[in-house]
């Protein structure tokens, strides 16, 4: 049996941009993508801590060191600049592998500075 498990998450990031007229996606600083193990164009869920909204989109790379978390396209109606969000990516795996799997969690402060090194959840 295959299970869908949390692969990684960027926890409590702060939205820095919201562009309703962009084609879609979430722009994330390349440093954070690498820290979490999220690839450009990978599907992610975005959970808005401020308003409870949840949506699925895909990650695109923002410039390294920019601390960017930009909500693009129609999803910009679901998150505003300053909102705190959680970005989650998932992976499918067999049950035996899932039992041994430790997702990566990157904790961020209100300025999108990493406050804890990536670790297993």
Swiss-Prot record:
List the InterPro entries: Asp_de-COase-like_dom_sf, Asp_decarbox
- According to its UniProt record, the EC number is 4.1.1.11
Q: Might you report a single GO cellular component term? A: cytosol
- Among the Pfam families in the record, one is Asp_decarbox
Its chief place of residence is cytoplasm
Name the catalysed reactions: L-aspartate + H(+) = beta-alanine + CO2
Q: Which GO terms describe its biological process?
A: alanine biosynthetic process; pantothenate biosynthetic process
What UniProt keywords are attached to this protein's entry?
A: Autocatalytic cleavage, Cytoplasm, Decarboxylase, Lyase, Pantothenate biosynthesis, Pyruvate, Schiff base, Zymogen
Q: What metabolic or biological pathway is this protein involved in?
A: Cofactor biosynthesis; (R)-pantothenate biosynthesis; beta-alanine from L-aspartate: step 1/1
Q: Where in the cell is it found?
A: Cytoplasm
Changes after translation = Is synthesized initially as an inactive proenzyme, which is activated by self-cleavage at a specific serine bond to produce a beta-subunit with a hydroxyl group at its C-terminus and an alpha-subunit with a pyruvoyl group at its N-terminus.
Disulfide bond found in the keyword field? no
Cited CDD domains: Asp_decarbox
Q: Give the annotated active site.
A: 25, 58
Uppermost EC category: lyase
Cofactor binding, per record = Binds 1 pyruvoyl group covalently per subunit.
Subunit field text: Heterooctamer of four alpha and four beta subunits.
Listed name of the protein: Aspartate 1-decarboxylase
> From what organism does this protein derive?
Maricaulis maris (strain MCS10) (Caulobacter maris)
